[in-house]
Amino acid sequence: MLEQRATRAGFVLALFSAATFGTSGTFATSLIDTGWSPAAAVAIRISIAAVLLAVPAVVTLRGRWNVLWHNIRMVTIYGLVAIAGCQVFFFNAVQHLSVGVALLLEYMGIILIVGWLWIRNGQRPRRLTIAGSVAAVLGLILVLNLVGDTHIDLVGVLWGLAAAVGLAVFFVLSAKSDPDLPPLAMASGGMTIGAVTLLILGVLGALPMHANVDDVDFAGHQVSWLVPVIGLSLVAAAIAYVAGIAATRILGSKLASFVGLTEVLFAVLFAWLLLGEVPTAMQLLGGVLILAGVALVRIDEFRSGTADPGDSHTIARSTAARDLG
């Protein structure tokens, strides 16, 4: 009973994380349309989020700096690959591919996770997981409106696949992280490392950094540039990453990554509500397929009960169940 409540809490956190991540496109678009470079938008997003999370992270550590130090290698990889790397790879991909194709390649990270669990833990994908993967990928193709002619470039494909690795690392490290390391501390540490990396790349000229303080068009209104910047940093970064880590610790990397696909559905929803971009019938069908894929993977895990007692997400689920009780 308590574990069921913990799992439900994990689903709520995962959907909340996906929804907050889904706002990033709307916030970033308003900045990019006024002359901001994508890299500058990402850099300020991560930098401010790192500052916002610093004090809460220190409070949750309660002086246990040794916990952070013992996990410094994992936090560093998380910051470099899952935060900074993933976004840099994606924006390099969109220089050679359409945004839809780049997103599809990035979300192939869920397939990488299934493969990783097979290779690393011997969790061979069963029929329901395979069916869920196929349904989810088909749903992505429809939601991202990739039916028809699309431009494919090998360099862009490689960057997109690198972004997929970054996405997979996000879920895998979030699931296997030390339960004693608070999600706030993990997110804050990773964002600090990611922000410093992005800023260094910008100073070196490896990433184009262009920004201004002009008013932006957001939700049909002219507002200060600070509105989307705060939205990107607080909602689409600080809150989104912390909720994502907490959810993945409860659900595990595979299930959490499939639930994370709903980010594209929330992105379409926010684009409709705030930018007036009405979703098509094919996109709605794609959304149904994505949700069906998530349901199939959840049913598969429920039937099999394959989580090992020592898995981080099993420990986290037990801890959450205790706290909920």
Set out the residue ranges of the language-model regions.
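Glycine-/small-residue-enriched transmembrane alpha-helix faces in small-molecule transporters
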Residues: 1-44, 149-176, 197-200, 313-325
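C-terminal-most transmembrane helix of multi-pass membrane proteins
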Residues: 2-3, 46, 145, 225-227, ...
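Hydrophobic alpha-helical transmembrane segments of multi-pass integral membrane proteins
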Residues: 8-13, 40-56, 132-135, 155-162, ...
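Juxtamembrane C-cap of transmembrane helices in multi-pass membrane transport proteins
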Residues: 19-35, 48, 87-97, 105, ...
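Specific transmembrane alpha-helical segments of multi-pass solute transporters/efflux pumps
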Residues: 20, 54-102, 106, 142, ...
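Hydrophobic/small/kink-forming positions within alpha-helical transmembrane segments
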Residues: 22, 79-84, 88, 110-115, ...
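Specific alpha-helical transmembrane segments that line the substrate/conduction pathway
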Residues: 40-51, 90-124, 163, 253-272
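Hydrophobic transmembrane alpha-helices of multi-pass small-molecule transport proteins
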Residues: 53, 108, 115-116, 125-146, ...
